[in-house]
Amino acid sequence: MSQSLIVALDFPGKQEVEQFLHHFEGEELFVKVGMELFYKEGPAIITYLKEKGHKIFLDLKLHDIPNTVKSAMRSLASLDVDMVNVHAAGGSSMMKAAIEGLEEGKQEGKERPICIAVTQLTSTSETMMKKEIGIEKTLEEAVAHYAKLTKESGLDGVVCSTLEVPKLREVCGNEFVTVTPGIRLASDDVNDQVRVATPKRARELGSSYIVVGRSITKAENPLEAYKTVKQQWEGVTV
């Protein structure tokens, strides 16, 4: 189950990544590379991480016209990443185009990357969604709507908060992948995320993957923090 624990490499550049990964010599991690790091270092950071034996969730949240997204996904698949994402708000045609691009770009003999869609950012509250985005549904209804659209479009799952996982299991079934950021140890600050949960709570609610950043990356001892999160996520009593 440790391979379903994704560590967010929210660093400004490769030097900071190298310093962080020094704590994990011999560990094969599942890491998330987001916009900040990828836009700074480019595909070279993916090559570096792959050479270290790590799995990669390339978190770029594509949202554009279908043809552009298809072409972009073709390029991303050629990097041999393991997971990618789009914004569900881009619509069904865009999401279907994303899958087409991944199939065309995947490396020979390999499966295409897992493709998931962002429903609502974990920094979004229901009040913000209604007042600023103009969606009149409840947050749970909006997330369920996007999740259903995502499944119908042929994607593997969604990014959502842990709070929405039980509802999505009802709507989309148990095989539908749920990737949940906003994971914190009970002693940590929530920072800029609104809908957060502990690793234990994420497990209880049925998340497929959890994404953990600051609780590990900002810890005094990142490896020990990683082990603590892993134990809580896997339900190990120590």
Curated annotation (Swiss-Prot):
This is Orotidine 5'-phosphate decarboxylase. Homodimer. Keywords: Decarboxylase, Lyase, Pyrimidine biosynthesis. Catalyzes the decarboxylation of orotidine 5'-monophosphate (OMP) to uridine 5'-monophosphate (UMP). GO terms for cellular component: cytosol. InterPro entries: Aldolase_TIM, OMPdecase, OMPdecase_AS, OMPdecase_bac, OMPdeCOase_dom, RibuloseP-bd_barrel. Belongs to the OMP decarboxylase family. Type 1 subfamily. GO terms for molecular function: orotidine-5'-phosphate decarboxylase activity. GO terms for biological process: 'de novo' pyrimidine nucleobase biosynthetic process; 'de novo' UMP biosynthetic process. It is an enzyme of class 4 (lyase). The keyword Nucleotidyltransferase does not apply. Substrate binds at residues 10, 32, 59-68, 122, 184, 193, 213-214. It comes from the Bacteria. Pathway: Pyrimidine metabolism; UMP biosynthesis via de novo pathway; UMP from orotate: step 2/2. Pfam families: OMPdecase. Signal peptide: none annotated. SMART domains: OMPdecase. Its EC number is 4.1.1.23. PROSITE patterns: OMPDECASE (PS00156). It comes from Bacillus mycoides (strain KBAB4). It catalyses: orotidine 5'-phosphate + H(+) = UMP + CO2. The active site is at K61.
